[in-house]
């Protein structure tokens, strides 16, 4: 496209406000706009905000996946869904946040054919996370409301449900990914009287698909999650009224902790995505000028994308096993004290904990026997010998104290 022709066209259409009919090849891709160059401080601030978000999400979700995968005690249905959500959030941080923040700041697509991939991973992983939360809430609801019945999400059923979720999410995202393409735009800067060329990654607006996506990713989950948590709350209230708090068993307390953790996850998701959906539902971009609108959308977009970073933090504070795993991974930080022995004899290794408990119990028994023997044979000399027995699984020495008369 001839640069001089575009500048002349911009002067007539933008500065002189003449009612011009644009050439067919420029229809919809030529715009008048003030200078969109950002100050260095603004660019650095936005870059730091999004890089920190990406780093937190990538590291946090990677650690969650490692904890679940590496430790056998974590291999059950509920945690399979947590692993699935962590993987989905990792994809969002890598393929969506990693490319979209520069596009939203500079209004220029730098990544070529990754447009299709970014469009897909902007929708599919979010749908996976939402559907996983709905499945978990239903599972928790059944466990609380019908505690004597068999758990609906066994290991096998959990894997099947996760596969179905990915199929549904892929089908949901495909229309947007297929329609996405990279197009050129020409912008006339009314301040500098220059024309710049930029590339946009976008898909034609389809109201039907937009409404379907809103229903799947936000409206339907709120209805389902709201109903399941209401039933859970009613069931817990009935249980509390019928049972003295001192008589609650560990199983009931574990259920309560899992429900609270899931509730925090749902609240974080709803709060983070609410401004984003309000912005698009009510077309709030029309209420801002070009400069303020960009910053408003960047803030709203950052809040929405930050939902992929909060779940690992919630797990760490709400679950002892995740907390131990995180402490062990970050033990190199001076303020975190987690020795290898503390990690290996923690709730992540229940077999070792039982072995240690048995050893300590034997030690206490032999110690009491020794005290009794000393009292009975105070006039005799005793020889105390340290014997060692080998654990048949790990061959770790367990020392037992025994005594005999000399």
Curated annotation (Swiss-Prot):
The chain crosses the membrane at residues 48-68, 77-97, 116-136, 159-179, 205-225, 262-282, 298-318. It holds the Pfam family 7tm_1. Keywords: Cell membrane, G-protein coupled receptor, Membrane, Receptor, Transducer, Transmembrane, Transmembrane helix. The keyword Signal does not apply. It is a multi-pass membrane protein. It is found in: Cell membrane. Residues 69-76, 137-158, 226-261, 319-406 are cytoplasmic. It comes from the Eukaryota. Residues 1-47, 98-115, 180-204, 283-297 are extracellular. InterPro entries: GPCR_Rhodpsn, GPCR_Rhodpsn_7TM, Neurokn_rcpt. The keyword Plastid does not apply. Its main location: membrane. GO terms for cellular component: plasma membrane. One of its GO terms (molecular function) is tachykinin receptor activity. Belongs to the G-protein coupled receptor 1 family. Not known. Putative receptor. This is Probable G-protein coupled receptor tkr-1. It comes from Caenorhabditis elegans. The gene is tkr-1.
